[in-house]
Amino acid sequence: MNNVIRPALVLFALLSALTGLAYPLAVTGAAKALFPSQAAGSLVVQGGTTVGSSLIGQNFGDPKHFWGRPSATAPQPYNASASGGSNLGPLNPALADAVKQRIEALRAADPGNAAAVPVDLVTASASGLDPDISPAAAHYQAARVARLRGLPPEQVNALVASHTQAPLWGWLGEPRVNVLALNLALDASAAAR
């Protein structure tokens, strides 16, 4: 019996050390060496202060800023430790009610905007933490942001255009605008005036 237990325990200890220590440390070390920004969470630092991550959406409630997609991480919006979709099916009345409330809130924030509300401004992403919106969603909000900041709409739309990222490799995904990067650029342009 000892002939069976001893090799099993040695193999268990060896594989535990290999897969539980050596492999994670090697992968983490390689990631930090090859991709230092991404390995640290793609943090955005401004003036020595971390202001967010380019990978995690944030709650911008100020109407002078662009708003991202709704968060599905209730009851704490944009909580990265609670990432996950809302799990509401397309026929669920709760989803229809939530979308209706979000449309009403967008209309109340910009009563003069009669354009159709882009779907990504009223529905959460699969993770509930999407940092990006479509260019259509950004342009939908541009008039409100320009009016509240006293900026020409052309300047705000140009800022949106300059922050629009093409699909990955030209075909994977859709064009997108990172809300944090756009709002930081907007704040920087306002501070430069």
UniProtKB/Swiss-Prot annotation:
GO terms for cellular component: plasma membrane. GO terms for molecular function: ATP binding; P-type potassium transmembrane transporter activity. Keywords: ATP-binding, Cell inner membrane, Cell membrane, Ion transport, Membrane, Nucleotide-binding, Potassium, Potassium transport, Transmembrane, Transmembrane helix, Transport. The keyword Ion transport applies. Part of the high-affinity ATP-driven potassium transport (or Kdp) system, which catalyzes the hydrolysis of ATP coupled with the electrogenic transport of potassium into the cytoplasm. This subunit acts as a catalytic chaperone that increases the ATP-binding affinity of the ATP-hydrolyzing subunit KdpB by the formation of a transient KdpB/KdpC/ATP ternary complex. The system is composed of three essential subunits: KdpA, KdpB and KdpC. This is Potassium-transporting ATPase KdpC subunit. It comes from Variovorax paradoxus (strain S110).
